């Protein structure tokens, strides 16, 4: 693992505050994008499963700290969702457009379902009414992943240019 943890922690703190304090005032189709999940997924797409899982852990942790969800539930859901999709990514050809879209949809579904199951198990919710938000959450996250992924990709190429050999 690289020193990216020093970038992950402050970035996830900011994203956690934005997700819980700012974005709820501007819902799109009744929901908001999960920015921390999408940034962790984009980072994992660029740097691999290990980095993605670490970023997902901190994304979930700070999302929980700044919301009313018990600490650790979103973290577990994000780690499971991102690790699962990054593991399956290895079986498909590389694409900088289609793969982020497909993996964002799949990560949203997995993390959403794991989150619902954990909330049911701990008695935080008592019905599955929130599952009705899943289709719009998928749509919003799929629309938001490309700008996030490409921004991180461009920053990565500027900060760490690839060595050219002749």
PLM regions: where:
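Terminal, non-globular segments
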Residues: 1-166
């Amino acid at each position: 693992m690289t020193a990216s943890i020093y970038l992950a922690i402050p970035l996830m703190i900011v994203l956690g505050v934005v997700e819980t304090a700012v974005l709820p005032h501007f819902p799109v189709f009744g929901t908001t994008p999960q920015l921390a999940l999408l940034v962790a997924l984009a980072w994992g797409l660029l740097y691999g499963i290990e980095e993605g899982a670490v970023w997902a852990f901190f994304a979930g942790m700070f999302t929980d700290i700044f919301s009313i969800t018990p600490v650790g539930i979103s973290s577990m859901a994000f780690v499971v969702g991102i690790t699962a999709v990054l593991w399956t990514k290895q079986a498909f050809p590389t694409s900088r457009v289609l793969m982020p879209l497909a993996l964002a949809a799949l990560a949203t579904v997995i993390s959403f379902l794991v989150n619902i199951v954990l909330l049911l198990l701990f008695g935080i919710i008592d019905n599955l009414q929130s599952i009705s938000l899943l289709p719009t959450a998928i749509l919003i996250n799929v629309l938001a992943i490309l700008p996030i992924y490409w921004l991180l990709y461009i920053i990565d190429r500027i900060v760490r240019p690839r060595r050219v050999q002749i």
